[in-house]
């Protein structure tokens, strides 16, 4: 049985933890790919199914890093509500907050900074 529809990141059946935790050649999980596709519903479903919001790919990036770099405010908010680590550092020692500032995504920066009082 196929887990994913053709050309889609969305599962066509209930999501198992083995599917959620499966990695591609970059070490990305389904959560990383859902963020990249801006699929907030899939992000929520992965969280509900018990997906780890702090899992890192092979570059050390979490899903929150990706949301911060791309300026995906709504997804960043969902990840934060689920316990995403705002202080997670990738292999280059950059945090999601620093990524948001570097890319000019001040709404995401404000959410990270204000809600979690981390400052820079």
What are these regions (language model features)?
Residues 13-17, 44-51, 77-84, 113-117:
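Ankyrin repeat domain, specifically the short helix-to-loop turn at the C-terminus of the second helix
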Residues 33-38, 66-72, 99-105:
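Ankyrin repeat A-helix N-terminal signature
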Residues 42, 74-75, 107-108:
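Conserved ankyrin/ankyrin-like repeat signature
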Residues 90, 108-120:
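Short, compositionally biased segments
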Residues 1-37, 41-49:
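Intrinsically disordered, low-complexity regulatory segments in ankyrin-centric signaling systems
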């Amino acid at each position: 049985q196929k887990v994913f529809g053709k050309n889609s990141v969305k599962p066509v059946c209930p999501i198992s933890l083995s599917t959620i935790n499966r990695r591609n050649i970059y070490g990305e999980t389904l959560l990383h790919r859902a963020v990249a596709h801006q699929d907030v519903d899939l992000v929520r479903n992965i969280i509900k199914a018990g997906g780890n919001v702090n899992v890192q790919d092979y570059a050390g990036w979490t899903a929150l890093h990706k949301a911060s770099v791309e300026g995906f405010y709504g997804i960043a908010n969902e990840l934060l509500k689920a316990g995403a680590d705002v202080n997670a550092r990738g292999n280059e020692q950059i945090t999601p907050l620093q990524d948001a500032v570097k890319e000019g995504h001040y709404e995401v920066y404000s959410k990270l900074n204000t809600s979690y009082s981390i400052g820079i």
